[in-house]
């Protein structure tokens, strides 16, 4: 198998520096946690389907493999926004809803901050536009007590463009800040590794009678994962994939 789309940065030196920065933050996460701070790998898993099998799965028997029914009843979809705590391996303050808007993401971050309001927070996120939104800038400015004039979206100041908003959100002097991974580097964000666990352990073989059932089962799995399975991922990136 050969991937057809890989990161081909315009500036390989800058790209390498960004990757190195993320790797260094992962290595620093335990020390940051010891000082009361949080390093979270954050992203959305969209389009999670509430699929109910049209007939019961026939269980494994001597001489016979398990036989699932492949006809489904479709009950809708949900979006999970999750934070993977790099230092502890726990999934923190997940939110699940029908959409992924800038308000949804800002609300998720607000809910996360509320778990430890005075702590330092570093969120590792990708380049999605909702991770550089006006709502997020206003949230961070208020939470950090920043009185600076923010300007106006598409016209002036911090709010003018995605690049100006990203510059503000990634300011290392802020108590709450965001670190952006380069484009086409989902492998660099540890939450993606946890999403694969969610798929294998729950979603792939799941049977969900409604979106409410799906939401409750995901939250129950997260609680179970945090209690029995959570541990930091072993960071091995030297041109190779992540390993658990």
Model region roles, listed by residue range:
Residues 36-37, 119-120, 172-177:
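Short glycine-/polar-rich loops that comprise or flank the Walker A/P-loop
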Residues 174-180, 184-185, 192-244:
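C-terminal anion-handling pockets and recognition modules
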Residues 60-122:
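Electropositive, glycine- and tryptophan-enriched low-complexity nucleic-acid-binding patches
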Residues 41-43, 83, 89, 109, ...:
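Mobile genetic element proteins and their domesticated derivatives, centered on retroelements
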Residues 1-74, 244:
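Charge-mixed, compositionally biased segments that are often intrinsically disordered regulatory tracts
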Residues 67-72, 143-190, 206-208:
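RNase H-like polynucleotidyl transferase catalytic core
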Residues 119-131, 154-156:
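Acidic/histidine-rich, metal-coordinating catalytic segments
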Residues 48-50, 130-134, 187-190, 241-244:
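Short catalytic/ligand-binding loop motif for oxyanion handling, primarily in non-cytosolic enzymes
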């Amino acid at each position: 198998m050969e991937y057809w789309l890989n990161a081909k940065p315009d500036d390989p030196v800058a790209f390498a520096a960004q990757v190195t920065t993320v790797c260094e933050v992962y290595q620093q996460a335990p020390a940051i946690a010891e000082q009361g701070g949080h390093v979270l790998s954050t992203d959305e898993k969209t389009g999670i389907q509430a699929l109910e099998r049209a007939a019961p799965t026939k269980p494994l028997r001597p001489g016979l493999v398990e036989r699932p029914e492949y006809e489904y009843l479709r009950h809708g979809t949900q979006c999970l926004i999750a934070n993977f705590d790099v230092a502890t391996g726990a999934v923190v303050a997940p939110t699940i809803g029908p959409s992924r808007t800038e308000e949804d993401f800002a609300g998720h971050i607000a809910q996360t901050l509320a778990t430890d309001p005075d702590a330092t927070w570093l969120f590792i996120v990708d380049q999605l536009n909702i991770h550089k939104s006006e709502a997020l800038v206003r949230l961070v400015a208020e939470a950090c007590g920043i009185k600076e004039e923010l300007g106006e979206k598409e016209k002036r100041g911090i709010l003018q463009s995605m690049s100006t908003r990203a510059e503000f959100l990634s300011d290392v002097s802020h108590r709450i800040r965001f670190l952006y991974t380069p484009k086409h580097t989902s492998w660099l964000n540890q939450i993606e590794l946890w999403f694969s666990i969610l798929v294998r352990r729950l979603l792939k073989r799941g049977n969900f009678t409604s979106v409410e059932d799906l939401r409750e089962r995901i939250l129950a799995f997260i609680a179970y994962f945090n209690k029995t399975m959570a541990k930091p991922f072993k960071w091995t990136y030297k041109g190779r994939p992540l390993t658990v």
